[in-house]
């Protein structure tokens, strides 16, 4: 599937798969700023045109465990109508460990289809083995 991409800055890097069979394409930082709360905002210098019926999801890379960073919205959602720069905002858990710099791969992008959902209000839901069991209900 082809997706249109626009470089917004000269040093932008087109996302690629690191290895054959990977689901996520690496996003690379081209800018680094801080918001009013001290969170670090990385720009990728790219904008994409996601087809209707698809969504872009921005996840932290697995190597984030080597940093003190936490993606502030857990998973970024890029709707098909968005045409702005893809960015990732992180909060610092501690101030004394590795942080990402410009040129580092900061996150990963997955583009996937999604169904359009229409809710049907009912009085009862079907029975299941789990039922209403929530947190911890499946055991240790």
Where are these regions (language model features)?
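DUTPase catalytic domain/fold
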Residues: 1-140
């Amino acid at each position: 599937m082809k997706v249109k991409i626009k470089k917004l800055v000269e040093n932008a890097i087109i996302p690629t798969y690191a290895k054959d069979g990977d689901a996520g394409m690496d996003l690379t930082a081209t800018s680094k700023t801080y918001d009013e709360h001290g969170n670090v905002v990385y720009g990728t210098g790219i904008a994409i045109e996601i087809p209707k019926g698809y969504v872009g999801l921005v996840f932290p890379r697995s190597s984030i465990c080597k940093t003190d960073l936490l993606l502030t919205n857990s998973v970024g959602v890029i709707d098909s109508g968005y045409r702005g720069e893809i960015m990732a905002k992180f909060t610092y858990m501690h101030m004394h460990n590795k942080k990402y710099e410009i040129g580092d791969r900061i996150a990963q992008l997955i583009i996937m289809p999604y169904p359009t959902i229409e809710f049907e209000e009912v009085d009862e839901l079907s029975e299941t083995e789990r039922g209403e069991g929530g947190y911890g209900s499946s055991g240790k």
